[in-house]
Amino acid sequence: MSRGLGDVYKRQVFGFINIPKGLLYDIVRHPLLQRLNRIKQVGLSSVVYPGAQHTRFQHSLGAFYLMSEAITQLASKGNFIFDSEAEAVQAAILLHDIGHGPFSHVLEDTIVKGVSHEEISLMLMERMNREMNGQLSLAIQIFKDEYPKRFLHQLVSGQLDMDRLDYLRRDSFYTGVSEGNIGSARIIKMLDVADDHLVVESKGIYSIENFLTARRLMYWQVYLHKTSVAYERMLISALLRAKELASKGVELFASPALKFFLYNHIDPEVFYNNPDCLENFIQLDDNDIWTALKVWSTHTDKVLSTLSLGMINRNIFKVE
């Protein structure tokens, strides 16, 4: 696909990332993707690793870059990929995280219970597809694993997808945990297709072993670090307390979007059938949560204020 240069992003980890004009450029500039600039990739891990300030937008661009490299590599090995398929799978990886909210897994445990970010991503992709007159139809097919060339879906969501290859290396870079610094270029070079499924050449087995080890170590040292987990539990407790107070009619400061979820019972059926849920969800980002916590830290309810002040001042529950 040679449509001219639409935009160039200078990013850590992979350097310059070129976004061609057309559909992919329109996706990157779309407010739903730009919203990811205001959502940190690793949530509350910055309490342990202060350098981990990178965003889901940066991750989406990095995954897009790796997808472009993977498509080029697979095509060079004789695997025929139409330009339309290449563009669609690039669109799918750009959009794979748009359903994340602030501190995504915290929200799934508190104010948006029972609705996963993957389901919300699909809802938002379908919404964008209507806006773009069906240009994302093929990307959605690939995302849902409904396209005959199954390896394209596996590049988006699989055991060796571009999502994992980017976030492990990116999170390793920003946290300084070197064990997660995988050789993504080497792994991509070893990819091939057999019977429409993604496979790895035998000489790439060592790289895959390193990848699996790196993933385990990153979960151990970063994603499930006891301090991060304790901080997350405090946030869950604060939001649940706020929701309890809201159910009793107590007036709480919150942005309109956050207030919608605090003062309404949202289960999967309501979320899927009430358009206001999605409209309010896409207005949420990290700023809504931190601003609310800052104000709640002086609330007259001692439980809410103690939890909120602890979040603001990093006075964290101790995990023994």
PLM region spans:
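Short alpha-helical catalytic segment bearing the HExxH-like zincin motif
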Residues: 89-94
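Histidine-centered, transition-metal-coordinating active-site segments
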Residues: 3-88, 102-108, 112-320
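Short active-site segment of divalent metal-dependent hydrolases/proteases
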Residues: 95, 99-100
